[in-house]
Amino acid sequence: GDIPTPAHTMNDGIDYVPMPNWKIFMIQFLNIAGTGPIFGAIMGAKFGPAAYLWIILGCIFAGATHDFFSGMLSMRNNGADLPALIGKYLGKTPRNVMLVFCVVLLIMVGTVFVYSPAEILGHLSGGSLLWIIMIFAYYVVATMLPIDKIIGKIYPIFSFSLLFMAVALIVMLLIKMPVLPELWDGLGNMAKEQDPSFTDNIFPCLFITIACGAISGFHATQSPLMARCLKSEKMGRPIFYGSMITEGLVALVWATVAMWFFYDSPTPGYEQLAAAKGFHTSAPMVVTTVCQDWLGMLGGVLAILGVVAAPITSGDTAFRSARLIVASALKLNQKPKMNRLYVCLPIFVVSIALLAWQSSNPDGFNVIWQYFGWSNQTLSVFTLWAITVYLVRKNKPYVITLLPALFMTGVCSTYLFISKQAFGLQEDLAYYLGILTVIIA
C-alpha cells in the first residue's frame, strides 16, 4: 500500500507543497545537475577515456543508488534533511559534523554557482560584477519564497534548455564523427603525456573532479527538497534514480565533446587554453567555444542558456537547503518571514566573502572547485554509510551501498593526503586506507 507522503501530511505552503510529477523530475534534475555534469566532465575528460568508465559505473552503481535512497529515506522520515537522517542512523557526533559540513558545502556550491554563470554572461555582455549582483538578488528572493512560487515556475524552462543542449551536441557529434582516443590506449593519464603542467594523479583526483556525473553528496541535500513535494512513493524511482541517470548522460556528452576538444580539435585544447588569457583558463571557456563553433549563433545562445541556468538553479536550491538545515538545527519555524530572513543573512554574508576572495585570486575558481569536489564526495560517504545502516537494520541487501561507501571512503581519504596541502606517499596511503576501512567495518 501507499504510505501517505510528507507533501500531504505536513503541507505548509512554503517547503512542503504537492507538485505534479514531471515538474518534480525537471526540478530534481536541475537541482542535482548544476554545472557538475558539464564543468566536472570537461575537467575530468583531461584524464582521458578512463573518465567514461567512472561516469558510467559510478552513475549506475553509486550515484543513482545514493540519490534514490536519500530521497526515499527522507520521505519515510517526514522530509527530514540530511543531518537529521545522519543523526538517526549514525548517532549524534556525526550529525553535528554533518550540520557544519552541509552548510559549508551548500554555501560553497552557491558561491561556485554564482561565479561560473557570471563569467560566461559577463563574457557576452556587461561586466561580470553586474551579473554577480543580479544573480545574488535572485538567490535571495528564491531562498525566501515558497517553493512552488519561483522554483516551480521557471525550472522547467531551464531544464528544457539543458536537455536541448545535450541533444544538439549529440547530433553534432554524429555529424562530425570526431576521432576519439580509444579506451584501451588511454586508460593511463593522458593529460600528463600531453601537457607537462598538469600533475594530478588519476586515482583520487579523477573521482573528485567528476563529482556530479557519477556520485555526489550534494544530491542528498537536494533530494529532501523534492521528497517534500512528491505525491506518491511509487514516483521515487523514476524521479530520484531517473534524474541521476539523465545527468550521467549529460556528463557523457560533455566528456566526449571535451575529449575531442583536448585531443583531436584542429588546435589541441590545452594549446588554446594556454593561448587564451585570464577568464579563459577554466571550463567555462570550453563550453563557450564549443557552443559557438558547433551550434552557430542561435544554438550557442540556447546552449549557453543551459550552461548558465544549471548553476544558477543549483545555487538557489543550495541556499534554500542551507536555510532549511540551519533552521531545523535551531528549531526555528519557517512560516514567519522574519525567521527566514535571520537564517539567510549570515549565509549570504559568508558567500559574498568567498566570492570576493575568489575574484581577486586568478586560480580561485579551480581551488574552490577542488575543495567543493572533495567535501561533496565526503558528504556522499556519510550518506552512503547512513543508508547502509538503515538497510542492515531492516535486513535488506546492504551490499549495494556498502561497496560504494567503502570505495568513496578510500577516494576521499587518499585525496586528503595526495592533494597539494599534504604529502603524496603511495605506500603510506595504501596502508593508511587499509587501517581506516578495517576500523570502520
Question: Can you name each region flagged by the protein language model?
Answer:
Residues I27-I32, G58-N78, L82-M144, A211-I215, ...:
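Helix-loop-helix module between adjacent transmembrane segments
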Residues G44-S74, P83, G300, A430-I439:
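Extracellular loop-to-transmembrane helix junctions
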Residues G1, F101, P117-L121, S128-I175, ...:
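Membrane-interface loop-to-helix entry segments
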Residues G1-I38, M235:
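Membrane-interface "cap" regions at the ends of multi-pass membrane proteins
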Residues V17, K92-L99, V103, L129-I133, ...:
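Loop-to-transmembrane helix boundary motifs in multi-pass membrane proteins
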Residues G71, L173-G186, Y241-T289, S359-D363:
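Extracellular/periplasmic helix-exit of transmembrane alpha-helices
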Residues C102-G110, A142, S159-K176, S216, ...:
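Selective recognition of specific alpha-helical transmembrane segments in multi-pass small-molecule
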